[in-house]
Amino acid sequence: MLDPQGLYAWEPKGLAVVDMALAQESAGLVMLYHFDGYIDAGETGDQIVDRILDSQPHQVVARFDHDRLVDYRARRPLLTFKRDRWTEYEEPTIDVRLVQDTTGAPFLLLSGPEPDVEWERFAAAVQQIVERLGVRLSVNFHGIPMGVPHTRPVGLTPHGNRTDLVPGHRSPFDEAQVPGSAESLVEYRLMEAGFDVLGVAAHVPHYIARSPYPDAALTVLEAITAATGLVLPGIAHSLRTDAHRTQTEIDRQIQEGDEELTTLVSGLENQYDAVAGAESRGNMLAEPVDIPSADEIGLEFERFLAEREGDN
């Protein structure tokens, strides 16, 4: 493997600001990370990243070489043409940024398109950055398509070696093989190297998984802020407002839709309530319910990923 440091470059001004922040944050910084392009049902992670960058002060600390990592023919960046010339190019960027929450507390955000190649080298580069920037906890987040109804609270699956930071959420999975991602490999390699990592996956109703689902993003954001101590009330308020609007629109579409969709949602509600009831009784008197098998979970992930890649 080539030297991972060849994949990124430091921004001197941003790095100097991080060093100043580290002098005041003896425990280290939190780093959030999410990449666009893999399974992110309900655009859960994308919504959080977009709102952070739109609403919070930030500056670039390190920039990855996207020419090495992004396959432009697979995900063609947009250029704007006006009259007789190209006027704008939406350059893909994979950056580490220093961000301030509402109280001014610093944290890091690594985001951009998911690398298409050199995953191992990329994961090693992220580890170098984590070491250099004194990261105490790395947190990734996304949505996964699940057989759950939109009329019930959004479930979470915490993963990594710091799931204790998101108590009260038991994983519905025993063991499952799903298509890999750079985000997951980074988590795996960081844990392997002894770093603290937390992943938060929201359960998004599979029938709306390809549309923005603010409820999922809000639930994930609340879990992240509770686990890290970050203060982001403006983003939470924005997501809560959008979530109310989205739920109203989903209910309207279901009421105006065919009977098959109504039956589907009703069946998912019954299944959800049966599982919740079984858990509250310790599974001692639970009636049998249909829980997705590992193979079914893997197929659902593959189907969603194939549909997403087909749109690109």
Predicted regions, residues:
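Predominant activation on well-ordered alpha-helical scaffold segments within soluble catalytic domains
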Residues: 46-53, 127, 184-187, 191, ...
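Internal, conserved structured core segments that host functional sites
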Residues: 105, 113-165, 186
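A generic structural motif
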Residues: 62-68, 137-143, 236-238
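Catalytic cores of processing enzymes, dominated by hydrolases/peptidases
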Residues: 147-230
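N-terminal short beta-loop-beta anion/metal-coordinating cradle
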Residues: 2-112
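A conserved C-terminal secondary-structure "cap"
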Residues: 208-312
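Hydrophobic/aromatic beta-strand patches that form the interior of the parallel beta-sheet core
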Residues: 62, 108-110, 139, 196-201
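Conserved active-site and cofactor/substrate-binding residues in soluble primary-metabolism enzymes
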Residues: 43-47, 117, 121, 181, ...
